[in-house]
């Protein structure tokens, strides 16, 4: 009704209302029991911020109730719980709770504001932000020695695997697994490391988790070496084919060519016939058919350092008569035999001086004349023709640097047919060169070096074999090896001397290897694959020859040349000498200039020696002409000169 509607605007004053004007306003009295305007609300709060905050919310509370209900409700204090609670809650900033429930400890109401007091580990106006103690710069890593784990409002320290937390809850201590479980690695060695343990094996072995044992690593299956790889328990060794001119590089894995350290003058001329082209057999064979009035004659220039060997051998077609021109003791020797006589004569000056000497042999009517430099040195009487003509022809066969094998038993005095020398300007049977130059020109191996020196030359492509008895019954040591080497190498790597047993092991070897020092070489003495002596950093590739002397028996190896050496321990040396002693009681062959076909791994070095070398063993100078076998390119008594640079070279 109109009457009821108008009562919303009615405001009745209470008793003593005049006295109330002098007191601070009361929220219950001013705005709940009665309606209040903003000014009246300010009387309650006595400040603008709280008033400005309260009054809009107060109007919301009023509008949330119907006016009819409100009029009835204000007759009793107990009848307005909803409005009262709504209005009473407006000034309390902590209701509803503005703080983060997890992070706050208390909420303090203020004038249109509130203050949240945070629990430890929280921050922010409403305590809504967790403090990350693990990133506190003033307390690095939260004071944890290893792991700091941040949690809402707190944090805790933890340890990595293999560590345990100490009582201070911050520091970690390593767990020694090897002490806790001594057998956990089986046959391997247990090594404790921070936070863990390792099962260690010697170098070259790998740990097997399943068997708990150390197993050999086959490095060769991993293609570690450029050429040959030999695996052995705990390691491996790379080898290069020295016989093909390779050596092991400094990295001990790759191969590189054996380089020349001293160039030699290997120039040859086809006009010079090399007499030592073949180790066994003749170098050149000629056959002459001349009128019966012809007599044997030979004229040539001859150069050698060799003291013995066959220059030429001539015989009749039916082998009934023969003539041998040779060198023995450096002098010309003539042996002849026919139906009339059998003779041997040696005479004249020594001509194995490395100079060119003109030699002529001429059959005269009653003698054979031998001349050197056109001066007669021998005149051998003969009762008749040296070779008998048949059917009006004189047929003669001439052999250079040797004779047919069957002749050897018919000689008046045996002679080693091998002769290291050269012939030029030959004239046989007064027929001049007779096409011989054309034959020689086509074959490079028959050409002689232009310049040579005295010595023996190893070309880096072959070996010489000797059978030497090293046993000495009068010596208490049983056997001994006394060696003297005079060397002038052309390459810095190669086997100079080796003893090889019947089972293809190499119980003793003396080799040359390039040193780690620039332009120098080492000499290594080895027993099988173990280096027992190393003579370091020698300048061997020079014009001057180097001298090395040593002696070995079952108890000791003694270097007689005053050089700096590096050796293994005395105990290990005796072990290696015992290996040598066992081999020396059996059969061994002596090789110069390299090795026969033995495994690469038999010695530390397997390349051929290249250069000049003279060898004396147990007081005997080894003559390569007396070797059991010798590579054809090895020169027994001549060595190429060192290449001398010219201004134009």
Curated annotation (Swiss-Prot):
Coiled-coil intervals: none
Main subcellular location of this protein, as a coarse class: secreted
The record's account of how the chain is modified after translation: The iron and 2-oxoglutarate dependent 3-hydroxylation of aspartate and asparagine is (R) stereospecific within EGF domains.
Tissue distribution of the protein: Plasma.
Short name of one Pfam family: Laminin_G_2
Disulfide bonds listed in the record: 31-36, 94-107, 99-116, 118-127, 134-148, 144-157, 159-172, 178-190, 185-199, 201-214, 220-229, 225-238, 240-255, 422-448, 612-639
Domain Laminin G-like: 272-448, 457-639
All copies of domain Gla, residue ranges: 15-60
UniProt xrefs under InterPro entries: Coagulation_fac-like_Gla_dom (IPR017857), ConA-like_dom_sf (IPR013320), EGF-like_Ca-bd_dom (IPR001881), EGF-like_CS (IPR013032), EGF-like_dom (IPR000742), EGF-type_Asp/Asn_hydroxyl_site (IPR000152), EGF_Ca-bd_CS (IPR018097), GAS-SHBG-PROS (IPR051145)
GO cellular component annotations of the record: extracellular space; Golgi lumen
EGF-like domain: residues covered: 90-128, 130-173, 174-215, 216-256
Residues with PTM (3R)-3-hydroxyaspartate: 109
Residues where 4-carboxyglutamate is found: 20-21, 28, 30, 33-34, 39-40, 43, 46, 50
Positions of the propeptide segment: 1-14
An example molecular function term from Gene Ontology annotations: calcium ion binding
SUPFAM superfamilies tied to this protein: Concanavalin A-like lectins/glucanases, GLA-domain, Growth factor receptor domain
Membrane-spanning residues: none
Glycosylation sites: 472, 482, 503
GO biological process: blood coagulation; fibrinolysis
Region (Thrombin-sensitive): 61-89
Subcellular compartments: Secreted
Annotated keywords: Blood coagulation, Calcium, Cleavage on pair of basic residues, Disulfide bond, EGF-like domain, Fibrinolysis, Gamma-carboxyglutamic acid, Glycoprotein, Hemostasis, Hydroxylation, Repeat, Secreted, Zymogen
Claim: Lyase is one of the keywords in the record: no
Function, in words: Anticoagulant plasma protein; it is a cofactor to activated protein C in the degradation of coagulation factors Va and VIIIa. It helps to prevent coagulation and stimulating fibrinolysis.
Protein name: Vitamin K-dependent protein S
Taxonomy of the source species: Eukaryota, Metazoa, Chordata, Craniata, Vertebrata
